[in-house]
Regions:
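Catalytic alpha/beta core domains of metabolic enzymes, predominantly
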Residues: 137-159
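Active-site beta->alpha loop and helix N-cap motifs at the rims of alpha/beta catalytic domains
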Residues: 14, 19-139
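Generic N-terminal amphipathic, Lys/Arg-enriched alpha-helix
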Residues: 3-14, 41
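Single conserved hydrophobic/aromatic residue that forms the stacking wall/gate
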Residues: 157-168
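ATP/adenylate-binding site constellation spanning eukaryotic-like Ser/Thr protein kinases
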Residues: 126, 144, 164
């Protein structure tokens, strides 16, 4: 389903809000220049600093403007399991092809806590979930063993931004 270059989009702002015109131009720029897929509301898109309304709008606009030309992998992660479920459910209803879910940041969950977090999201949502392991930002590193456990129930993709060569 996902191949090639899937670009993490920035979220442009103007004055006190989302610059929708610039964002739409950015989406079309990537599609017109051969990008394989779009990733709105990820770390590059400043997802932790977006309001819920902004977050949802960024995802909705990306899905609408891409119009099925390329897959959309919506950033829906949160340190709150219920919030991640809510954001993922919204992305699914809006038409996202998958969700990019960052490991819960700040709270430092155990490996079992990480497993339960992703399992709860997977159990409530019907789109593929990509595990986004980025310990330099989230302050938690998902172990390979935890990833292997998660793969047992359809979490088939990982974006691993760990600095450790041994984790590859």
């Amino acid at each position: 389903m996902f191949k090639g270059s899937n670009v993490a989009l920035i979220t442009p702002f103007k004055n006190n809000g989302l610059d929708e015109e610039a964002y739409i131009k950015l989406i079309h720029f990537h599609i017109n220049n051969g990008t394989s897929g779009l990733v709105p509301a990820g770390t590059t898109g400043e997802s932790p600093t977006l309001s819920h309304t902004e977050h949802q709008r960024v995802i909705e606009l990306c899905i609408k403007e891409s119009n099925g030309k390329v897959p959309v992998i919506a950033g829906t992660g949160s340190n709150s399991t219920e919030e991640a479920i809510s954001l993922t459910t919204h992305a699914e209803k809006a038409g996202a092809n998958a969700a990019l879910v960052v490991t819960p940041y700040y709270n430092k969950p155990t490996q079992e806590g990480l497993y339960q977090h992703y399992k709860a999201i997977n159990d409530k949502c019907g789109i593929p979930i990509l595990i986004y392991n980025i310990p330099s930002r989230s302050v938690i590193d998902m172990s390979v063993d935890t990833m292997a456990r998660l793969y047992e129930f359809c979490l088939l993709y990982t974006s691993d931004a760990a600095d450790e060569e041994d984790s590859v």
